[in-house]
Amino acid sequence: MFDGYDSCSEDTSSSSSSEESEEEVAPLPSNLPIIKNNGQVYTYPDGKSGMATCEMCGMVGVRDAFYSKTKRFCSVSCSRSYSSNSKKASILARLQGKPPTKKAKVLQKQPLVAKLAAYAQYQATLQNQAKTKAAVSMEGFSWGNYINSNSFIAAPVTCFKHAPMGTCWGDISENVRVEVPNTDCSLPTKVFWIAGIVKLAGYNALLRYEGFENDSGLDFWCNICGSDIHPVGWCAASGKPLVPPRTIQHKYTNWKAFLVKRLTGAKTLPPDFSQKVSESMQYPFKPCMRVEVVDKRHLCRTRVAVVESVIGGRLRLVYEESEDRTDDFWCHMHSPLIHHIGWSRSIGHRFKRSDITKKQDGHFDTPPHLFAKVKEVDQSGEWFKEGMKLEAIDPLNLSTICVATIRKVLADGFLMIGIDGSEAADGSDWFCYHATSPSIFPVGFCEINMIELTPPRGYTKLPFKWFDYLRETGSIAAPVKLFNKDVPNHGFRVGMKLEAVDLMEPRLICVATVTRIIHRLLRIHFDGWEEEYDQWVDCESPDLYPVGWCQLTGYQLQPPASQSSRENQSASSKQKKKAKSQQYKGHKKMTTLQLKEELLDGEDYNFLQGASDQESNGSANFYIKQEP
């Protein structure tokens, strides 16, 4: 147990030969703080120096781990408490006929019997907590166990720019050293030790205490953004004791020499890491703010809703007319489904007026600048027109990309899209997409990228051919150049694990896997469920999160469905899905499209095969190329 370097000028030549043979620390990224043995960080325990007893609280520990040069106290607090009572202690010692010594307990804040009783109670509490945790881990879901047992990999935090620390994760990687609580210890107080990152999985890190080398027996998972994870040097600055794990406490005779060698030149967290975590979890949206959000029962319109709660940037919105406040809708604050008050009127979008004539007390309109900005577009030249055909993700069945039609052109680049063959007569299931939305595609996108295209319901001329369909319906394809072709260097790869919102039940966040990558489009599979529940999602969707996000924010994570739960829940889930979809979508059939330099609306198209099922790097023109 120790607080900090007393002095690095101390002679460390007494280190054992086993310590001298320790392997060198592997090189690490350059922009993390370097731990220096300059005498300003730590004091290390020296097994040769024997044991000591704190003169304030009576705790026994390694002498060199004690506070101050005289090694009379186990911590700063004991030293300060003793100082205020030193005169009283001195008088008491003289009356007893014994001068105070470094190993003698001079003053107790409470009787020894009471301390022993408290310590026994503390040990019993620890045992009960251990049993409780074991029971929970057996019955609950553990990302660490799930990843270890299956050798999974997780998407890095840098893939999620909207998530906490997504833009300032830096070079946190394997071999970075941190200070963490030492759970392999029988002391009644909370103590710490240094550990290195063995593996990263999102926010979660597999840690190994220094001194265990290749022994993984006490490896443990924790959230790197948690309150108990600190950069090396934090204990010294905070007056917290560092104690080697009990399992290896006799492994080295000179812990100072060992740690100096292991830590010199190694990397640790930035000193302001916890501050950055805290700042990245501050959200501008607050309860009682009013917004316009899509009406989940009539997708073609918006309604006024009030922010009920904010969790990790996700908003629970309650529709303003809901008397019992149970008619709600979940989405992220950067979702394209929410807008400032007055947005619908400004672009010509349908809007359901509220029966409430005036704002309720405490409710106020959300400032417009808090909402996600859309890319500005020029509608003065060639632009989308009503009746043009395209391909679009069905908002009511996100596992499918369907034949679709532009039903209405709104202001500021917004479009109302209808799914061919399954539209409601009143257009209540039209959906608003921006022209730059990554959820709409030019004609032929699915064929080029070998994605199943869902033809219009009731269309019998199969296999579906766009050329024939356009001719039969007297329609034209939306010009390719009007679609968004940007492909960010997102970093996702097939097989990566993450936490994803079930957009058909947006209050649920589930264990999920990336199963396909088509440029910026990701196929998300919910672990334990059939493929029919998969969803197509953009790589920059605010509904995707790193492993450990739910734990970090306190949101409930839905674990993979077991075989029994799938059988029990499948029927009800499908019923919910069909009810929510409003319209029957027809059987899904694999269609092979045959577009081979045919004329679509009198224009020649050459097809460019886009890279798929791999990590995208940089932008690429992957759509059909329209020749001038």
Curated annotation (Swiss-Prot):
It comes from the Eukaryota. PANTHER family: MBT DOMAIN-CONTAINING PROTEIN 1 (PTHR12247:SF79), POLYCOMB GROUP PROTEIN (PTHR12247). Residues 562-573 have a biased composition (Low complexity). This is MBT domain-containing protein 1. Chromatin reader component of the NuA4 histone acetyltransferase complex, a multiprotein complex involved in transcriptional activation of select genes principally by acetylation of nucleosomal histones H4 and H2A. The NuA4 complex plays a direct role in repair of DNA double-strand breaks (DSBs) by promoting homologous recombination (HR). MBTD1 specifically recognizes and binds monomethylated and dimethylated 'Lys-20' on histone H4 (H4K20me1 and H4K20me2, respectively). It holds the Pfam family MBT. MBT repeats lie at residues 141-245, 253-350, 351-456, 464-560. Residues 609-620 have a biased composition (Polar residues). The modification N6-acetyllysine is found at residue 115. One of its GO terms (biological process) is regulation of double-strand break repair. Residues 1-31, 560-590, 606-628 are annotated as: Disordered.
